[in-house]
Amino acid sequence: MNFGEAIERVKTRSYIARRANWDNDVFIFAQVPADINEETIPKMQSLPEVVKREITEAGITSLSYQNQICKFDNGDITYYTPTGNEIFANDWKTKSDDTLVEWEYL
């Protein structure tokens, strides 16, 4: 499957990976959109204390995580930006909630 087809699958909460060049524990997914309320912000482990203080002092009462494409790499999750080689590759595969056992090749 090409990158365009693969990224469309990410939008449906599937995840994608390359058949070649990547370890078995590397894949791309979209973070589920989330709204964080003001009671949760001070407890967030993903934000530095100085950022939490800035948010609170600015009077912001909620945070919204939207459209974040992430790369899972052997336990590490980082933001994903595709390379040119990845964009033009035709060896993408996908898994969805319905088929977690088998990779689907389109």
Question: Residues of each region from the PLM?
Answer:
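Extended non-catalytic interaction/regulatory regions in multidomain proteins
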Residues: 1-72
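Short, compact, well-ordered microdomains
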Residues: 62-106
